Every structure is written in C-alpha cells, then in structure tokens.
Amino acid sequence: MKAFLILEDGTVFTGTSIGSKKEIISEIVFNTSMTGYLEVLTDPSYAGQAVCMTYPLIGNYGICHEDQESLRPWPDGYIVRELSRMPSNFRSEDTIQNFLKQYDIPGIAGIDTRALTKLLREKGTMNGMITTDAAYKLEEIIPRLKAYNTGKVVERVTCEEKTVLKGEGPKVALMDFGAKDNIAKS
C-alpha cells in the first residue's frame, strides 16, 4: 500500500506503508545511528515525534525485547529507506513490521531518508504527516501541519509509580520524566 510523508513546507515523499495503517501528524526528526533501531523506538525522548532513520537498512536483526530502553515504543511514526522483512539473528523475537503494528505506530518505507535528513538539517525540524490517503489536498494539510503542537510530551513519558532498584554504594534518586531504563540500571 502506498504511503505519503507530507512536510509543512509542501515537500511530499512517496513510499510504502509499514506498521499501522493510520494517519498521524507529528514533528519529524532524524537519527543517524547505524544500529540500535529498537533502542531508538523505545527511547522516551522520541515521544511526540516521527523518527527518520538515516541508515539505509533497518530491521535486519529483528526485535530483541531485552534491548528495549523502556517497556514500549514512543515515536508517533517511523520512517525508513528499506525495512528488512526477514530478520536474521538468533535473538530475534519479532519483526519491526509486527512491532509497529502491535503498538499502532504507522510508518513509511522506500523513501530517500538521506534527502529528508538533509532537508531537515538545512530548514530545521518540521511537522509532517504520514498518510495512506492518496487523495490528500496539500492546501488543506499544510495549515494543519503548521498549526500542530506536540502537546504535553513530558506527561506522556513521566513515570507514575515509584520503583526501587537494589544496588551497592550510595543511594541515588532518579526523577523519571522520560529516562531510559539503562540510565537507572547504570
């Protein structure tokens, strides 16, 4: 199924729908990591954003839940050049496609993610829409994109319950307003 990434400056990228088949408006950001896509997906700092991965092949080692930075993914959307549909890793428990669907996260594959990253680097972060609606009307969408605000992202990622981790050495308190699990573990 075709998908479209529409940016607030009117730029449109056409690709293939991945994950959930729903429309989202979000702030579009990029990540240049060559590995660690699951860590990116489960990093609370990406809440309220759609993440563009610049590395050209994503998903080749699958989903290994042990590597997650939190219990769930946080981005509103996911943007990749090529999505591996058959991961090869003895630790793999799932595919990114299934992971995105499970958490109702839409995405787009098959676009020039490096061109998108260059555009964002030159013009600054922009809002964008991921949609499968081929009958979109730019004149209606662009004002919505320009008016979009990510909202209260910190409230979404803030820990609501106290957690105690046993360790050696001095006692440390961590106020969790979106901390990755590995911060608490270290």
Predicted feature residues:
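RNA-binding accessory domains that recognize and position tRNA/RNA substrates
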Residues: 1-186
